[in-house]
């Protein structure tokens, strides 16, 4: 039996040391530590989604470049609109949650999207002004924006499609503020028109 000895090495937090066969020799290498928790436990924030994909992922790179060019996310929203910033974020979130799944457009394929609830006029009337501002129905005399929202899920397109119902529901609930900025947000110009 070969004699062994113990050594201690420091390994970065996101890596692990692993013995591997390389060129006929056994060597100790550092490899990325894989988080095996379900994706819905790993991705709770937009930042989590960016980290899951990595800074070199094209969607993350584009977002970071635009934020840098605009001198911050707030300036980017002023430059391009909150809905555009929200779309960029939702692309990243969707890509991360789908873990490599992309629609193939086959006849038997299902794609899922978040679905948002329409409030009754009574429920709407009990909202704060800020809550009312975030509802699609505020532009109508009635808060029942039936024609305004019932079909809007189909307008999300395949870029924001999920591989299963659970992921779509999770994304809609967990990232509701980002979805609201994408789907429902009213620009300041539209607010001024409503006040007239």
Residue ranges of predicted features:
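Short acidic DE-rich linear segments
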Residues: 1-2, 188-196
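Charge-rich, low-complexity N-terminal segments
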Residues: 2-84
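Acidic, glycine-rich loop-and-strand cores that form catalytic or ligand-binding grooves
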Residues: 66-124
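Short aromatic-glycine-(Arg/Gly/Cys) micro-motifs in beta-strand/loop hairpins
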Residues: 108-157
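Extracellular/cell-surface secretome signature
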Residues: 145-147, 167, 179-180
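A short, charged, amphipathic alpha-helix used as a generic interaction element across diverse proteins
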Residues: 163-177
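Short arginine-rich
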Residues: 175-186
């Amino acid at each position: 039996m070969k004699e062994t000895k113990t050594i201690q090495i420091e390994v970065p937090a996101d890596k692990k040391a692993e013995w591997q066969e390389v060129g006929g020799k056994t060597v100790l290498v550092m490899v990325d530590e894989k988080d095996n928790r379900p994706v819905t436990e790993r991705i709770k924030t937009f930042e989590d989604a960016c980290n899951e994909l990595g800074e070199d992922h094209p969607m993350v790179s584009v977002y970071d470049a635009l934020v840098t060019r605009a001198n911050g996310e707030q300036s980017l929203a002023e430059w391009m609109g909150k809905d555009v910033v929200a779309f960029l974020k939702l692309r990243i979130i969707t890509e991360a949650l789908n873990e490599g799944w992309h629609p193939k457009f086959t006849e038997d394929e299902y794609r899922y999207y978040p679905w948002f609830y329409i409030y009754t006029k009574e429920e709407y009337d009990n909202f704060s002004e800020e809550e009312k501002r975030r509802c699609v129905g505020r532009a109508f005399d009635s808060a029942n924006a039936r024609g305004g929202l019932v079909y809007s899920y189909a307008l999300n397109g395949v870029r924001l499609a999920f591989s299963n119902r659970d992921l779509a529901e999770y994304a809609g609930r967990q990232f509701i503020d980002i979805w609201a900025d994408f789907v429902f947000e009213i620009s300041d110009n539209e607010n001024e028109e409503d006040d007239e």
